[in-house]
Structures are given as C-alpha cells and as structure tokens.
Amino acid sequence: MMVLDGVFERHPKLKGASVELGAGWVPEMLKRLDYVVKTWSRVDKNLSEIKRKPSEQLIEQMAFTPFHHEDVGMLIDTSHPELYLFSSDYPHVEGTTDPIGRFERFLADYDENIKNLFYSENFLRLFPNSRI
C-alpha cells in the first residue's frame, strides 16, 4: 500500500526492509504493482500522480529477506539483485546451522559483485549508518 498510496514518491529518502516474510512473492508483486499503476492511473487520480514505476521505487527504497530454502538466484534473475538481503534466524531452528551455505547453493553461479550485494551492500545502501 505504501507504493500505491504514493508514500515512496513523496518520501524518496525513506528506506525499509521486509524481514522474516520470505521473498518468493516479490518478482510477481513487482509486475502486478507496475500493471496496476499503468492500467488504473487513467481512472484513479492518486495513481496518475505516481511518476516512478512501483518496481523502480521498491528497488531503490526497499529490500526483502528470502527464506533459506528460497532460490535467491532465481529471485535475482526474475527481478533485480538490489532487492534482496541476507538474513538468518540462527540460532533458532529455522535459521539452520549453516545459513550462508544454504544461500551459497543458489548463488554458486553468480559473481562476487552479486554476492556482495546480497550479503552486505544492499543492507548498507538502505541503512548507510549501520555497521556490519
């Protein structure tokens, strides 16, 4: 709703993350949000005022944490590498004993730049005053 209500348009410095919800749904959500704005902006005044595509807003201002069993490589391929952040629930059981190894399975064919985005750079882009 923040996208469709124009929150990210009005506050371009606002950053955030969707954590512990998985990310398998993100690529399709981006397509649907873009479609909604394109289709309904002809009849909805608020949507007609949105200048940047919803997918562009989310790439610049949000990130999502996939579950360890979700293929982050496929998510990157079907959307954008700047959308995803590493996370783990370790030491909880759902965090597994090897959270990095779980994601590395899906990132084995990707270069170091993509891995750095996932493991640290995307987080630092959104939260530049953080220390990791």
How would you name each of these model-derived features?
Residues 1-57, 71-82:
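Histidine/acidic residue-rich metal-binding segments in metalloenzymes
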Residues 5-6, 14, 24-25, 43, ...:
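Mid-to-C-terminal alpha-helical segments outside catalytic/metal-binding sites
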